[in-house]
Design a protein with these regions (language model features):
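Catalytic toxin/effector domains delivered as secreted proteins or via bacterial secretion systems
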Residues: 2-132
Length: 132
């Protein structure tokens, strides 16, 4: 795995800042090398393989982020579980278009009610430790 700051346009990375620590449904779970104990951060903005996806878990093993990459290896969208402008965490999606990361599209609300059933059903197999 690489890093977002050392991506080569020809593909791949100049240094490794991420390591694979497992898989869920054939999608690699990554952990940033050297990250402080309780820190999570976000997945790299570029993937090593066109069209791949990665998963990031919290230090306690609970789901934090799923990131899908396009054929150009750039981040296409994220599924996140967190407190984006909310007192409580909820499941939401960010779609990348250009350089901006738009406001989230809720998949659940802060109470845990499923709002977007089709997205939830599609990605629920990756939501390790999330109780709705």
């Amino acid at each position: 795995m690489g890093s977002s700051g050392s991506y080569l346009k020809s593909g791949g990375f100049t240094s490794q800042e991420w390591e694979q620590v497992g898989e869920i449904k054939s999608v690699k779970i990554l952990r940033k090398i050297g990250l402080k104990k309780d820190a999570t951060g976000n997945l790299p903005l570029y993937g090593n393989t066109p069209g791949t996806a990665y998963i990031l878990l919290k230090p306690n093993g609970r789901f934090h982020q799923f990131r899908q990459y396009g054929e150009d290896r750039k981040a296409k969208f994220d599924i996140d579980y967190g407190r984006h402008n909310s007192a409580k965490p909820y499941l939401h999606m960010h779609t990348y278009s250009g350089k901006d990361r738009p406001e989230p599209m809720p998949i659940t609300n802060a109470k845990g009610d499923i709002i977007n059933k089709s997205l939830y059903e599609k990605y629920k197999g990756f939501l390790k430790g999330i109780k709705l």
